[in-house]
């Protein structure tokens, strides 16, 4: 466990290995790891059960979230709660609560922007060479190369639109983050080690 609180916000291109790297960083530093759990915690805050998130993956795409929970709700509450802005605000509040409570790695969800005024937050963006990203997606989802390329393109498009809309910044632009890393250069574990060293040096841990 590290001395002093640190929050590591990680944005990533789909297929870059970001989830695995985020988990490695959390394990190496002995801190918490939050990904899709943020959505579940946000759901509880506004009275939804975890079953509402059964079909929601790591992509911050509330459009599908609406589809999944629409059948679970009825009455006038639906109109007031079922808005992107409301859900983004609730999720942002959950992110702030977690950051206040503990050191952790937070994957995506505009957490770098939500915590932009927290001087203990370091923001990262992970990319990888295209062939590496395609390979990972083919292996993970058991799809062919053409399908993998389509999934990568559509997922990154959604992530960029979501991030750009809520932050007013540009997703993946180096100016939006403290550090951008191409995972292909060092591999997943090498990248995790590099980031851990960067964090320790930045905060003099």
Please annotate each region the language model reported.
Residues 117-140, 145-153:
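Conserved phosphate-donor/acceptor-positioning beta-strand/loop module used by diverse small-molecule
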